[in-house]
Amino acid sequence: MFKKYRPVTPGTRQLALPTNEQLTRPCENSRATVKPTKSLLLPKRRTNGRNNNGHITCRHKGGGHKQHYRIVDFKRDKENIPAKVASIEYDPNRTAYIALLNYADGEKRYILAPQGLKAGDKVQTSDEPPFHIGCCMKLRLMPLGSVIHNIELYPGKGGKLVRSAGLSAQLMARSGGYATIRMPSGEVRMINENCRATFGAVSNPERNLRVEGKAGRMRWKGIRPTVRGTAMNPVDHPHGGGEGKHKGNTPQTPWGLYTKGLVTRSNKKSNKLIVKRRRKK
């Protein structure tokens, strides 16, 4: 659900923000959500897109509100111990929501919250049913056609694929020690069937409908302005300079690399595991 604000100021004219109804609140009528668990927080130091030499390696980053990093369990390696979902919480470091699990042995962990998971639900990592949303299992034990997320690339290394808000993959087939997965991009690839994945799609599927409404809200997120190349000088960009508005050459990055369709992915050994590329040839 989204709230569209009345245009009482220029900043609220286009503003559309989520109501975050899935998040857990301390009481029924409270607007505030529950506070994060302190034992699962780490201090986060901003690099603002600079490397160890101070050079900009990622443009358009800088400033933003202070944040704590939430320690999220992507491995889901606590086997055969049931856990109860204590709360669904906001995480400023990722697009999806996170869920706080209270395990039967007393340990607490954060996981990525799938769609439909709510406080009070039971989840666990095991080799047996139930095949419920939020439960984790090896690919070789999952029913074909399952909708999954947080998929490992190598057994025991933790989930690397399908972790952003609203995404999901589908288990298509199994053969020769590999599971065939259809990715959100349309790519079909094989993954070791001993890798783990979690049932369900990632939470917060309507995130792409969010409208910030003003530049200042982007600055709160640590996102700086993006300047067009044609508005620069020739020393700053291949599109810069000239008399009046004109592009005059092939679309390029600031470093002269052709863009708009050029494949930049390097060949890797894992190419043989890709059954169908996401791009149609």
UniProtKB/Swiss-Prot annotation:
GO terms for molecular function: rRNA binding; structural constituent of ribosome; transferase activity. Keywords: Ribonucleoprotein, Ribosomal protein, RNA-binding, rRNA-binding. GO terms for cellular component: large ribosomal subunit. Disulfide bonds: none annotated. It holds the Pfam family Ribosomal_L2_C. Residues 43-63, 228-253 are annotated as: Disordered. Residues 236-246 have a biased composition (Basic and acidic residues). InterPro entries: NA-bd_OB-fold, Rib_uL2_dom2, Ribosomal_uL2, Ribosomal_uL2_bac/org-type, Ribosomal_uL2_C, Ribosomal_uL2_CS, Ribosomal_uL2_dom3, Ribosomal_uL2_RNA-bd_dom. HAMAP family: Ribosomal_uL2_B (MF_01320_B). Belongs to the universal ribosomal protein uL2 family. Part of the 50S ribosomal subunit. Forms a bridge to the 30S subunit in the 70S ribosome. NCBIfam families: rplB_bact. One of the primary rRNA binding proteins. Required for association of the 30S and 50S subunits to form the 70S ribosome, for tRNA binding and peptide bond formation. It has been suggested to have peptidyltransferase activity; this is somewhat controversial. Makes several contacts with the 16S rRNA in the 70S ribosome. This is Large ribosomal subunit protein uL2. It comes from Protochlamydia amoebophila (strain UWE25).
